[in-house]
Amino acid sequence: MSVLLWNCKNDKAGSDASTEDHMHDHSMVSGENVQPPLFNEIMAVHDEVMPRMKDIEDLKEQLRLKIDSIEVNMPDSKYKADFRFALAELNRSDDMMTDWMHHFKESYDTISSPAGKNDFLEFERAKIEQIKGKMETSIKIASQTLANTPMK
């Protein structure tokens, strides 16, 4: 419903073709009754984990500050490796999500057959669940690393 309302507000020419183009362009974002249920499931997982990207960026910044502090004040600290590992895990999950987002839309738009789209969506559902798990794990590792080190 919001896609249609959005299109009505933004369709200055009022043509049906223009509205259809807008609906196609924005159906990927809204996922409302235009895409198959499996697509909507995938987008629900995406929408669930996307806000965590901010958490990842915040944790990466905190870890970078700790690493910089260690290198200046305690170059032989045993914690440096822990911070670097946690940062690498966050970078991996960030890269996985970014790569998935770019690949998903590009690939989905090129598939024309319903069976091909379904196969693709089955594969992508597993992939986004894996990314979700990686993000949760990397956030947990980084949070625990920051919390369990005596450095302030």
Where are the regions that the model predicts?
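C-terminal motif of bacterial Sec signal peptides marking the signal peptidase cleavage site
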Residues: 4-7
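Immediate post-signal-peptide N-terminus of mature secreted/exported proteins
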Residues: 11-65
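Short E/K-rich amphipathic alpha-helical oligomerization segments
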Residues: 17-26, 62-73, 99-120
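C-terminal amphipathic alpha-helix
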Residues: 32-53, 113-152
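Charged/polar positions within long, soluble alpha-helices
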Residues: 54-61, 65-68, 95-109, 133-136, ...
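Extended amphipathic alpha-helical interaction segments
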Residues: 63-65, 69-80, 87, 145
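Long, amphipathic, charge-rich alpha-helical segments that form helical bundles/coiled-coils
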Residues: 79-128
